[in-house]
């Protein structure tokens, strides 16, 4: 009987230890908020570009800001070239951080290349280009998407231009690649977003009145409103935001109660690139050369005929 009881207790203890081990393992294996911050989109979307053409970064960075992308008009197979995403903004601007303090803006970018294009291996990147991209870490959007690259967050003051060293594919070694014109999609953001992936608002939003009424009290971190139907509602004002209403002021539904702290935003740009065949270029040059030679010979022949005709007329 004692042995049976001891056996039961031993089994229960082992099960308890196993369950505890699984709980601890799962806690440490979950992505932490600080680690997940640069890759919110990667966790939530299979592709950074929606069916309507919009890049998903715009779902959290609501303000529209300009972004530019520069790529060569055409590239040869198996060559390294620069793709540049420009994210301009006023470097004197400061954003509201999560703590409510003011701080410098950071930037991030996504580059969607045609199939087969990818970030160039380190041994293929020229030394001059390495100096220009020093400190930039390039990450695949998904493990199996070599042609979709994300970067950031980076210091905005030092990275208003982000250079991507790109290696073009070679149709001679990959039968799935063909010469032709392809689309390139780029997106760039500066500053913090207004929406978390959960749908909750960040503190980079103006606080608005939930209903029409009169402001009954104002403090540094809250505004109380007596609505037109006699109810009282209190809106919290996150740290770093400035209250723009005063007691006794009438406010409409949706009217701002605080300043708008957002100084950032997102922008996207589409362009095209041609994967050009070197053989085609050579034959094109031969064709143009043949035309030029033919035209030259025709001109010479015409002058010769004119001389003969002039001689016959004089005779």
Curated annotation (Swiss-Prot):
Residues binding heme: 37, 57, 60-61
SUPFAM superfamilies on file: Cytochrome f subunit of the cytochrome b6f complex, transmembrane anchor, Cytochrome f, large domain, Rudiment single hybrid motif
Transmembrane feature ranges: 281-301
Subunit structure: The 4 large subunits of the cytochrome b6-f complex are cytochrome b6, subunit IV (17 kDa polypeptide, PetD), cytochrome f and the Rieske protein, while the 4 small subunits are PetG, PetL, PetM and PetN. The complex functions as a dimer.
GO biological process: one example: photosynthesis
InterPro entries in the cross-refs: Cyt-f_TM (IPR024058), Cyt_f (IPR002325), Cyt_f_lg_dom (IPR024094), Cyt_f_lg_dom_sf (IPR036826), Rudment_hybrid_motif (IPR011054)
Cofactor: heme
Mode of membrane association: Single-pass membrane protein
Provenance organism: Acaryochloris marina (strain MBIC 11017)
Protein name per Swiss-Prot or TrEMBL: Cytochrome f
Source organism phylogeny: Bacteria, Bacillati, Cyanobacteriota, Cyanophyceae, Acaryochloridales
Subcellular locations according to the entry: Cellular thylakoid membrane
Main location: membrane
């Amino acid at each position: 009987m004692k042995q049976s009881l001891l056996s039961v207790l031993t089994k229960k203890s082992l099960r308890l230890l196993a369950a505890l081990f699984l709980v601890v393992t799962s806690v440490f294996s979950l992505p932490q908020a600080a680690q997940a911050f640069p890759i919110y989109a990667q966790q939530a979307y299979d592709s950074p570009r929606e069916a309507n053409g919009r890049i998903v970064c715009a779902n959290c960075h609501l303000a529209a800001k300009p972004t530019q992308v520069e790529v060569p008009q055409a590239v040869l197979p198996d060559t390294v070239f620069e793709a540049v995403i420009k994210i301009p903004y006023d470097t004197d601007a400061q954003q509201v951080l999560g703590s409510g303090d003011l701080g410098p803006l950071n930037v991030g970018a996504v580059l969607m290349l045609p199939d087969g294009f990818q970030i160039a291996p380190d041994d293929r990147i020229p030394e001059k280009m390495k100096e220009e991209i020093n400190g930039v870490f390039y990450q695949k959007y998904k493990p199996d998407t070599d042609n979709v690259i994300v970067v950031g967050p980076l210091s905005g003051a030092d990275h208003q231009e982000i250079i991507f060293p790109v290696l073009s594919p070679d149709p001679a070694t990959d039968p799935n690649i063909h010469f032709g014109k392809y689309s390139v999609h780029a997106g760039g953001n500066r500053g913090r977003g207004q929406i978390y992936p959960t749908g909750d608002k960040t503190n980079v939003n103006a606080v608005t009145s939930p209903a029409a009424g009169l402001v009954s009290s104002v403090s540094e971190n809250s505004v109380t409103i007596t609505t037109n139907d006699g109810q009282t509602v209190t809106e919290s004002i996150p740290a770093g935001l400035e209250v723009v209403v005063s007691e006794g002021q009438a406010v409409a539904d949706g009217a701002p109660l605080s300043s708008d702290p957002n100084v950032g935003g997102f922008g996207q740009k589409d362009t095209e690139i041609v994967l050009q065949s070197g053989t085609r270029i050579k034959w094109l040059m031969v064709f143009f050369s043949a035309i030029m030679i033919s035209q030259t010979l025709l001109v010479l022949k015409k002058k010769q005929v004119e001389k003969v005709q002039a001689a016959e007329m004089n005779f």
